[in-house]
Amino acid sequence: MKEWLRALCYGVLIWGVTGLIGCAPIEPLPPPPSTPVSVSTFTNAAGKWAGILKTIPPLKDDDWVTLMIRNDGAYEFVSVRTIGILHGKGTFTLIDGKLKAETERGWVLGMLYEEDGRRMLKVIGASKDGTQYAADLAPTK
């Protein structure tokens, strides 16, 4: 009987500690940057960016995409997908303070946002088959 009571006490103790930890306040993530920044040179957006690539309309799973932009506007991207790897490269042009590229497979438009020292590259695009894509990319190393 003592073993049963001891097990019950440990169970209640573990349940109580778990409840306290689960109810601890969690600091929310700051909202993504919302102030648009005009891209005047490719160096403003150069670097490595990464984030979740979403399709519109949504497919079963979202994919992770990494985009590398060089100082001359050349770019390469790789998306690790559940059905394989999607990759490509090209060169951006600057139009109205935004990054734009068009290839035989589709088009993409990139807009830079900045706020409180944080940056985000919002990318939208579409493939020639009509599939639309969107991603909010953050700088990465």
Regions found by a protein language model. Give the residues of each.
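Bacterial N-terminal signal peptides that target proteins for export
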Residues: 1-12
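C-terminal motif of bacterial Sec signal peptides marking the signal peptidase cleavage site
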Residues: 19-22
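Edge beta-strand at a domain terminus
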Residues: 27-37, 86-96, 125-141
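N-terminal helix-cap/turn-to-beta initiation motif at the start of protein domains
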Residues: 32-50, 66-70, 87, 141
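Short, solvent-exposed coil/turn segments at beta-strand boundaries
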Residues: 45, 67-75, 94-98, 112-121, ...
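N-terminal glycine/threonine-rich, aromatic-flanked beta-hairpin/loop signature
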Residues: 59-96
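Short, surface-exposed coil-to-beta transition loops
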Residues: 59-65, 85-89, 104-109, 129-135
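An anionic, turn-rich surface loop/hairpin at beta-sheet edges
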Residues: 81, 88-90, 95-116, 123
